[in-house]
Each structure stands twice: as C-alpha cells, then as structure tokens.
Design a protein with these regions (language model features):
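Short beta-alpha connecting loops at secondary-structure transitions
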Residues: 50, 86-91, 179-183, 243-254, ...
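Terminal amphipathic helices with adjacent charged low-complexity linkers/tails
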Residues: 20-123, 333-341, 370-415, 605-627
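Glycine-rich ThDP/TPP pyrophosphate-binding loop and its adjacent helix/strand module
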Residues: 1-4, 9-44, 243-335
Length: 627
C-alpha cells in the first residue's frame, strides 16, 4: 500500500539500494493483508532481528499484531517500534500521513543509533539542514476557495437582516467564511438536526438551513422529517442547482425537479413552500407544484425569506438556478443557449465604491488600477453571465447585446509554416538518472489538472515512467490546485507519487499566489528549483469582501525568488488574452515557455501529440503551446 511506497521512496532518497541495504543489515517486508497477519511469514522474517520498525498510517493495527505474534518466540527481535519507540516516546503519529521525508528521517535516525555509518549520517544532516520554511507569511494575498462567477449560491445563501443560517455539505458551505451570518455544520444528511436540540437553549426562535439538492435526495429529507416531528421553527433553503457541482456536475440521483420536491415536502406536512428562481417565467401557469407553493424572482428573495421566518414550524424555500460551472460546460457544448449579452463597467464613470461586488459577490469583478485610483472591471474570460452585478444602483454599468468580444486573429497552428520555429534552439535534454519532479500550481477551474495530464501523456508517449497526483478538492472553486508530476526513465524508479519536501526541480506557477503558500514553498529548494511563474496579479476572493484589499505582488515575487535557484516571471495571462482573446490559454502558453527553456523532460513533439489526443480546443492549445 501507500506506506510501502513511501518507504521505498525514502530508501531511494537515502541512496540505499539492495547492495547497500545488505551491508547495513536492512531488510524490507511488504504486508499484503493487514488483518489478520499471516503468522508464519512474520515469524520467519522477524526472528533473530535486532530491531523491527513498523511503518503504517493511522492506528497501530499491524504493529500490535507483530508484537503479539513475536512475544513468545525464542528468537524475537530486541525491539519492535512504530507509533512509539523503546523508551515509550512518540515516534510516528496516528494522525496525518506518512511522507518519504519523514520516513527517511526515521530510518536514518534508527540506523545511526547503532551504526555510525558515515553515508547515512551525512544524509541525516542534509535532511535536517533542508527543513523548509513553511511559516505563514503575513501581508500577502491568499488563494481561498470561493463561489464561482455567477454561482447561484451568491444570491441564495443571503439571509435577511436579523436572521442567521447554518451551513451544510456542498459548495454552499463556503458561505461560512463569507459575510453571510452563516455558521455551524453537520455531516451530510443531518442538516438542521442540530437545531432540534439547540433551539431550546438559545434566544433566537428561528434559523435558516442551507441544503443542496444532491444532499436532499441522498439523505437530507430525513433531517427535514425530524424537524417537522420536533415542531421547531426552521426554514430549509433547498439549493436546486441542477447538478452535484462539487463532485463533477452529475445530476442528483432520481433526477428530482423543484415541482417533485415540493410535492414530497407537502406530503411530509410542510404547508409553506416558496420557489425562488432567476427565471420564474419558465414555469408557466400550468406547472404542477404542490398546493400553496409561491413562485418569485430572485430579486424578491429578501421579502420571501422575511415571510418564511414568521411561519411557525418548518418552512421551505426552493432556490432554482443552474450551477454556473455547469452552465458554462453546457454552453460550450451547445447544450444550453448562450445569452447574446455582456455587461461592462465604464471606468470613466466608476468611482470604485465596490457596491457591484457587494451586490453580486462575484469574483469576475476585478480591480482596475488607474491614475485616479482603484476602479472596477468585468473579467470577460471568467464571466458566466449571471448579471446580478448590474442590480446595484450604479450608472457605470453598460449592457451590450448583439456583440462579441473582439479577438486578435491568430493563425491556426495547422496553418503555420512548418519551419517557423526551426531557428529556435532545441530544448536541452534533462538527465533522468533520478526522477524529475514538477509541481504545477494554479487556480481551480483554469486547466491546471489538464496540464498535469498532458505532461503525463507526453511522458507515456516517450515510454518514460510517470506519475501524476492532483490535489484539488474544493479548490476547483477558485482555490489553490496542485499537480505533482514525477518523470523518470522507468516506472521502477518512481515509488511515491508525491513530490517530497525541498525536492521540486520545477515549479510551474500558473498563479503566483499559490506558489507562496506553505504546501508549495516546502517543496522548493534554493539550490535546485527552477521556477517559471505567471506573474499576472489575478485577484483573490478577499477583494470581493474588502474593496481595498492589497495583493502584495512585489512581496510575492521576492518570496518566490528567495525560494528558487532561478526564477522566470512572465505575464502569461496578458499575453494569451491579447493573442487569443481568452485567458484560458495562459496555462498552455507558460507550459510551452517552460519546455522551450529546457525545464520539462519531454520533447515538444510529444506534448503536441498529447494535446491532439486530448481533443479539446486543439488548435488554440497548439498555438498557445508553440508561441
């Protein structure tokens, strides 16, 4: 399992091969089935050993069995250590994860307790010297996950003045760290059940509870049923966004509709049900909702919620608006109409008050620094056409219909002369005597994972060993995304799929804010790490909440330079937007830049083949990569 891979990687990092292990008297046993252990093999391996070290994550399941099996054996080891050492001091934690760096240190320290091997002693000194600086740096931007541009939760999670809400499982949980009077959460399916108990001991006599349509279908209806039985005053806001957005955009099980949900809730005994939507006109006069259900436009959400909180018992608001990310996908695939309309901000009129951000809670409204101070602009590349930003009382907004964004005409890659790049020097080849470690960093939803997949496929095309590990989670919502890529001559050379501390050979920084985060800085080494950084100052979520938020770009650049052997800054977003009319090409552009510099161990031809195999926006990606 994973522990075995980390131990193998640790031994490789310590330069302990089979010959050297034999010299040290070091042996390795891989457990195939952790419970119950096969006793005869354990006895055979452990007998006459001086010390057994058990590496496992979480609780000591294997360690305890080994101790029990060997306890009465005549040839038992002198010591068996794992979670604790022979002095009963902590050795390995039962929380967190095992990493090759930690395992290397444990192995080196255990060996040198009894064997003063000079090679291992030197390695141990290097491990301790290379301990990265991971302290949180104050005064710079932080890439916190946030609602996507045009996300329905921007509107649906608002609560009227004087009320509070409780968070739930789903993207809407992020309301808990926004200015939304939203707090507390439970496990999936218990949303609101905590109010049954606490309502008897607080001054508030009512609360709102957010719950996604996927959670509702999965198990949330049980919590609603319990609230009805307990006769507590609570309004459930069922956030119907037509997709299980946090896990891939698939439809909820059973494919529920607002009308079906209203009937189910009415059958549970809930008499006050309201539907709120960004397009209520779609229902028509014959839509089959439960008796007494009211339908309102989202602009009336405040009045609707104020009414719902006055009713005794359980009330429900079904907020119906399609997930913004899913809308973008469907429009791209021709499955949903793309409104022939865009909103812009006239910076000559804008006074930079930030009311548009406050009204819409949208990350596509970005700062525009001018001679007259900070103003606002709409990022047309990320805008999902929700248009809630125009709801504020602002004369600077201009709505344009029947027009498209002017794009510079770029010659398709297929039409470029084949010899146009011949004068460029060939990228230098990288020695793969040991795995080459790349970390791609960027913002969720911008194609960071795709870059990792393409480099992985290019390596595969060249018959190299490669591993790709993506760390995403809720990061797809505008937060930090990391892709760990390890390329080697052979798959046998790769054990752990995660880049170790101070081991990154290349940081491909598609967003420089993410590069300065602790999880990335601990991978960097001032003696070996090359950094290719997109230094465009993409605004962070903090700007939505604070119109005077400082990005700290100069400090960020200094931190990256201080952590790298060599740093190359390039404004990939500015260049790609000018060339292609869309910033989405920036990640592919900076990848091509890094490869031309000789910092990616694959050939350009292999990357181009991988782009073609991916079969998504092939011409644009090829052009961005080549330029």
């Amino acid at each position: 399992g994973k522990a075995y891979a980390e131990v193998r990687q640790a031994l490789s990092d310590l330069n302990i091969d089979e010959t050297y292990a034999e010299k040290l008297g070091l042996h390795l046993f891989k457990v195939g089935m952790p419970w119950p252990l096969e006793e005869s093999k354990i006895i055979e391996f452990c007998s006459n050993m001086e010390e057994i070290i058990v590496f496992e994550e979480k609780r000591p399941l294997i360690e305890d069995q080994v101790k029990e099996i060997m306890f009465n054996q005549a040839n038992r080891p002198q010591r068996i250590v794992g979670k604790r050492d022979e002095d009963n001091k902590d050795l390995m934690a039962s929380t967190g994860e095992l990493t090759p760096d930690f395992v290397s240190e444990v192995i080196a320290e255990r060996i040198t307790k009894t064997n003063k091997d000079e090679h291992i002693l030197n390695k141990l000194r290097l491990i301790k010297q290379n301990e990265p600086d991971t302290a949180v740096i104050e005064g710079i931007a932080n890439r916190t996950p946030y609602f996507c541009s045009g996300c329905p939760h921007n509107s649906s999670t608002k609560v009227p003045e004087g009320s509070k809400a409780m968070a739930g499982i789903g993207c809407h949980f992020m309301a808990a760290w926004m200015d939304r009077d939203t707090d507390l959460f439970t496990h999936m399916g218990a949303e609101g059940a905590n109010w049954i108990g606490m309502s008897q001991f607080v001054e508030d006599d009512h609360i709102f509870q957010n719950i996604g349509d996927g959670t509702y279908t999965h198990s949330g209806i049980l919590a609603i049923r319990a609230a009805v039985a307990a006769k507590v005053n609570i309004t459930y806001k069922i956030l119907f966004n037509d997709a299980t957005a946090m896990t891939g955009g698939q439809p909820a099980e059973g494919v529920p509709t607002p009308a079906k949900i209203s009937h189910q809730l009415f059958g549970e005994g809930i008499k006050r049900i309201a539907v709120v939507s960004d397009e209520p006109e779609k229902y028509g006069i014959n839509t089959n909702f439960a008796e007494g259900t009211t339908i309102n436009h989202r602009s009336e959400i405040d009045q609707v919620q104020k009414d719902l909180r006055t009713w005794p018992g359980v009330t429900v608001m079904i907020y119906d608006q399609t997930c913004a990310t899913e809308k973008r996908r469907r429009r791209k695939r021709g499955l949903m109409e793309d409104p022939d309309k865009r909103s812009f901000i006239n910076d000559l009129v804008c006074e930079g008050c930030g009311d548009c951000s406050k009204t819409s809670n949208c990350v596509s409204i970005e700062p525009l620094e001018t001679k007259l101070g900070r103003k606002r602009k709409v990022n047309q590349s990320t805008c999902n056409k929700d248009f809630s930003c125009v709801d504020g009382f602002c004369p600077s907004f201009v709505t344009v219909q029947g027009a498209t964004i002017k794009k510079r005409k770029v010659t398709p890659a297929s039409d470029l002369p084949k010899n146009i790049f011949d004068k460029l020097p060939k990228p230098k080849e990288i020695n793969l005597e040991k795995p080459f470690d790349i970390v791609v960093t960027g913002i969720g939803g911008t194609g960071v994972v795709t870059i990792g997949a393409l480099i992985g496929m290019a390596s595969h095309i060249e018959n190299k060993g490669v591993s790709v590990l993506d760390q995403v989670g809720i990061a797809q919502k505008g937060g930090a995304v990391l892709s760990h890529i390890r390329v080697a001559e052979s798959p046998k050379s790769i054990h752990s799929v995660k880049v170790g501390k101070t081991s990154a050979d290349l940081i491909l920084g598609c967003d420089m804010v993410v590069v300065t985060s602790s999880p990335v800085r601990e991978l960097m080494n001032i003696n070996t790490t090359q950094s290719i950084i997109n230094d465009h100052e993409t605004p962070v979520a903090g700007f939505v909440l604070d119109p005077d938020h400082s990005f700290g770009g100069k400090r960020i650049r200094q931190i990256i330079e201080k952590s790298s052997k060599e740093t190359n800054f390039i404004n990939a977003i500015k260049i790609s937007t000018a060339m292609f009319g869309d910033s989405i090409a920036s990640n592919m552009f900076i990848t091509g830049y890094a490869l031309q510099k000789g910092f990616i161990p694959v050939k350009p031809e292999s990357m181009e083949e991988a782009i073609k195999l991916n079969n998504m926006a092939v011409d644009m990606n090829l052009s961005a990569f080549r330029w």
